């Protein structure tokens, strides 16, 4: 039997597994693309379900999986390795996700075979969006902007395909306008931006002038000190899953330089990545790399005292987990700071220019490249400091490219790029 036949049979079997899982998938907005269990939002939400519900689903799955759940480990490993090696790009890559959805044993083997994004350079599971990109080459993506709905869609690939059928959606964001403020809500799907949804992955909040932005992650980063903020967030939940952490986690701050004289020129920005240590970019350094969804805040940090109906906004420092949440910020490691790569003025074109290596074709104030800004005392090689970690630029009407690499994740890079779309009266 060929590998494609095996995967096809697995998908047919998977579609018939468990009316409970089907009802769970159909009940979630955005998770019903064909109702398949291997869709990203469903896999994300399944890992955040209560233990009792997961146990019931596992028992039901075991009764219906038959011979596939009892394959010899050596054969199972060989099958998944072959599928992983042959299906390297999307949409064929969904076959690897299908293998992880067969049963618990298949999922464990698939998790062993599929390496982190930094190691293999391939985006496979939703957790890949929170992992650092590869070191040797950037992950190339593009962003579509819908002005009518203030929606921004991040896709994997060099540029949009002709009909868009094979474009792999990674993340979606929507600009939410309030009476006194605005924010960007980031989700796994393009039709559900509820803060209480299982597809919610984070948000971006600007200040009034549009000069400072705070990036909040829905999950606490690994290897971080948690420091409660005195001003709790005002997000209210109608119904909160016991597996979801009650908090937004301040993982980065993006600041734009205030332009008093309103002189024309490129925007100047600085990104402080609170959850990434600066030393991670040196040879042998390691950025925090999550390998699975964190099920509950209680598994990582002690409970935080909150006001009724409110949740704490939590800040991080790039150090080991601390039990004393009320103490001062522990700064054993300096956070990574990113800055604009200095452009050059082109006399003939009469504009500021950067070498985007063909990935940006339209001049725009939104175009930028970010490199590391480190203290000389840290001993980071000059070559590492010159590497472009994130670049963003325009290629057409409402279409932009976004290329990122280690140590940024897709979520962090996308959130930084979203700051370019907000109004900045004090910076222009």
UniProtKB/Swiss-Prot annotation:
Family listed: Belongs to the TUB family.
Summary of the tissues where the protein is detected: Ubiquitous.
Listed Low complexity bias regions: 47-65
Gene (UniProt): TULP5
Domain F-box: 65-117
Entry superkingdom: Eukaryota
Region (Disordered): 17-65
Protein name: Tubby-like F-box protein 5
Pfam families from the UniProt entry: F-box-like (PF12937), Tub (PF01167)
InterPro entries named among the record's database cross-references: F-box-like_dom_sf, F-box_dom, Tubby-like_C, Tubby_C, Tubby_C_CS
